[in-house]
Amino acid sequence: MTQANLSETLFKPRFKHPETSTLVRRFNHGAQPPVQSALDGKTIPHWYRMINRLMWIWRGIDPREILDVQARIVMSDAERTDDDLYDTVIGYRGGNWIYEWATQAMVWQQKACAEEDPQLSGRHWLHAATLYNIAAYPHLKGDDLAEQAQALSNRAYEEAAQRLPGTMRQMEFTVPGGAPITGFLHMPKGDGPFPTVLMCGGLDAMQTDYYSLYERYFAPRGIAMLTIDMPSVGFSSKWKLTQDSCLLHQRVLKALPNVPWVDHTRVAAFGFRFGANVAVRLAYLESPRLKAVACLGPVVHTLLSDFKCQQQVPEMYLDVLASRLGMHDASDEALRVELNRYSLKVQGLLGRRCPTPMLSGYWKNDPFSPEEDSRLITSSSADGKLLEIPFNPVYRNFDKGLQEITDWIEKRLC
């Protein structure tokens, strides 16, 4: 496979690529307070993107590698959209966020091609896939260079899956009224059909960002993981996010009886951030098909309906929301009105009794997901569990929280 040649073809120079921070044209709020969150990273002065070190390290990237790439971006004297923001270099060249992370990914891609040990080669491919995803972050619609990086990430992920333990199958699901979508079914060693977790990821992530979750938490317990991309990104890019946020995941859930490797009588959903919006909707609409729903840092009501909460959120995250909703040119007021319709409380779901067991994990003072959202989820369930995750030490508590969530899921599936 000529991955290097593919890279050259995809990133072939053109006249002018749009720079990521210009893709969503909203009225800026001006100066914002600093934000730090376990799942989303933190705002750092002079960066448009939130720097999500915890999640990048959790996915396997060395902290020194992150700093090296950041340093190359900072040191560039190329033209920027905003001279005050390091990661707004225009065009695919040195200093551009996508260029620097993709260049780093190509280093690991070359290591993977040269490595004779299949498992080590698979690790290198996975590392490259993760770096390509960081290159494409935050995955805004219309970001041509980011979409090319996503394509390279998916290719690298497929290469990794052929070499790593267990089995991965790429699956296509038909969706009435539109294009089919592609998902990845990750299966542990042993004979199926397997109890399965349907992953509902955040809006600023790709489905290939969750391999660590499968490898460290689900696979050792004999649980499979099925992923699909959220609407408007990756393999689901032809679908826009709508108030029926769980449309694609619901279609996949209904198709599981026809998937021989999945025990469709033992399925749970796990939602990160806005993915919890999807998972909780499924808990209400498809309770006979789900044994349990777990959420982490859920975005189900407050951020979607509270103007003060929205004012505390970084510009990049609001751009992500606007991009997913297809509101690239909307005013902040129009965006607020539309976001309110995505609140599961406003929709009349949360607050009603739900038969599906639901767990929700949260951090105190989380700017994206206050404790009240998690309490709303668990108090609405006939079998609810609230899990507070202490912030420091952040990595250790994140791991401990995921272990507790996996324990809870396993008890309801196995």
From Swiss-Prot:
Catalyzes the hydrolysis of esters. It catalyses: a carboxylic ester + H2O = an alcohol + a carboxylate + H(+). Keywords: Hydrolase, Serine esterase. PANTHER family: DIENELACTONE HYDROLASE DOMAIN-CONTAINING PROTEIN-RELATED, ESTERASE FRSA. This is Esterase FrsA. It comes from the Bacteria. Its EC number is 3.1.1.1. The keyword Coiled coil does not apply. InterPro entries: AB_hydrolase_fold, FrsA, FrsA-like, FrsA_esterase. The lineage of its organism: Bacteria, Pseudomonadati, Pseudomonadota, Gammaproteobacteria, Enterobacterales. It comes from Escherichia coli O157:H7. Coiled coil: none annotated. It is an enzyme of class 3 (hydrolase).
